[in-house]
């Protein structure tokens, strides 16, 4: 098993382990050798796919721990069994938005008193740099900062993983709206298409999470995930696809003003996501700052052979 600096096994509890990223984090923690626990919440009810997923984790050696956000003591009992807690609660507005519920997790960790480190659900844009974000999407960053402030107030050691767009949502579709597949003939280009964006495969984000959670170099730090070969402009991403398919797409250039005007007609939940999109593709919020005194995942863990976007896109050809 993976050892901590204190010569103990690293016991990790993953909260949100049946979600798209959470299930990958569970698998990565098991592969890394961590003694892995997964919170089994009664809210899954008779969701057979989630039940079967939990049982598959158990077969691989994970421990299932019962706990509910409506039962504080059950959460305290769950976190008392581990050294590290990783949250992968969804922050997607148009599906489920569970960021605020992590306050209950913070309270449980504080009361338990034994958790050496907490990794809250972040993974995307650094909320500490998004004070200028437009509403209603700003709510996500406000809530993530509320979680961070609660962590600080409780004196809980932590690591924040941030800084990239998940390839499943932003890469395979060449950053197009309303689809997760590449366009066949036409593609919308945001602005001039030359703003740098960071893409990462979700499996790789999970691997970095599993590696950083007990690394003394990342304690009480922000870890940016910036795979060098995946720091691309949208135009570069499109050109990779055109090279793979040997077909040039018809390009429509969407100005920032037109993009913002189009947002106004959408439902609130979609306005939030599109606002984030604007900050990424027009303002370059993922790449407009240096790492500084914090850390960067690919430099810390060069042994992780991350998936480049040219490799990622091949499955769609």
From Swiss-Prot:
Keywords: NADP, Oxidoreductase. Expressed in roots. Detected in stems. The keyword Oxidoreductase applies. InterPro entries: NAD(P)-bd_dom_sf (IPR036291), NmrA-like (IPR008030), NmrA-type/Isoflavone_red_sf (IPR050608), PCBER-like (IPR045312). Its EC number is 1.23.1.3. GO terms for biological process: lignan biosynthetic process. It catalyses: (-)-lariciresinol + NADP(+) = (-)-pinoresinol + NADPH + H(+). NADP(+) binds at residues 18, 20-21, 41, 50, 90-91, 95, 98, 121, 144, 166. It comes from the Eukaryota. Pfam families: NmrA (PF05368). Gene3D superfamilies: NAD(P)-binding Rossmann-like Domain, UDP-galactose 4-epimerase, domain 1. GO terms for molecular function: pinoresinol reductase activity. Disruption phenotype: No significant difference in lariciresinol content. Prr1 and prr2 double mutants show a complete inhibition of lariciresinol biosynthesis. The active site is at residue 144. Reductase involved in lignan biosynthesis. Unlike conventional pinoresinol reductases that can reduce both pinoresinol and lariciresinol, PRR2 shows a strict substrate selectivity for (-)-pinoresinol. No activity with (+)-pinoresinol or lariciresinol. Abstracts the 4R-hydride from the NADPH cofactor during catalysis. Belongs to the NmrA-type oxidoreductase family. Isoflavone reductase subfamily. Forms homodimers. This is Pinoresinol reductase 2. It comes from Arabidopsis thaliana (Mouse-ear cress). The gene is PRR2.
């Amino acid at each position: 098993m993976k050892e901590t600096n204190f010569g103990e096994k690293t016991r990790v509890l993953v909260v949100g382990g049946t979600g798209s990223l959470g299930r990958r984090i569970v698998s990565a923690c098991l592969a890394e050798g961590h003694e892995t626990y997964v919170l089994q919440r009664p809210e899954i009810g008779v969701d057979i796919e989630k039940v079967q997923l939990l049982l598959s984790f158990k077969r691989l050696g994970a421990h299932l721990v019962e706990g509910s956000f409506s039962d504080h003591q059950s959460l305290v009992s769950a976190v008392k069994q581990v050294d590290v807690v990783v949250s992968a609660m969804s922050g997607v507005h148009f599906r489920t938005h569970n960021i605020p519920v992590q306050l209950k997790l913070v309270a449980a960790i504080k009361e338990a008193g034994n958790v050496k480190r907490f990794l809250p659900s972040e993974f995307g844009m650094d909320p500490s740099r998004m004070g200028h974000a437009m509403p209603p999407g700003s709510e996500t960053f406000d809530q993530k900062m509320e979680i961070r402030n609660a962590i600080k107030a409780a004196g809980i050691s932590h690591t924040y993983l941030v800084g990239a767009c998940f390839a499943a949502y932003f890469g395979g579709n060449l950053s197009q709206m309303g689809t997760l597949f590449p366009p066949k003939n036409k593609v919308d280009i945001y602005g001039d298409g030359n703003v740098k964006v960071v893409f990462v495969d979700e499996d790789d984000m999970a691997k970095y999470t599993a590696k950083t959670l007990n690394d003394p170099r990342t304690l009480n730090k922000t870890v940016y995930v910036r795979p060098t070969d995946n720091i691309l402009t949208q135009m570069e991403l499109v050109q990779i696809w055109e090279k793979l398919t040997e077909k040039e797409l018809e390009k429509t250039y969407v100005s920032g003003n037109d993009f913002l005007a189009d947002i106004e007609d959408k439902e609130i939940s979609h306005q939030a996501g599109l606002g984030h999109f604007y900050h990424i593709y027009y303002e370059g919020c993922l790449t407009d700052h240096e790492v500084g005194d914090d850390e960067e995942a690919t430099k810390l863990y060069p042994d992780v052979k991350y998936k480049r976007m040219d490799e990622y896109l091949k499955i769609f050809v």
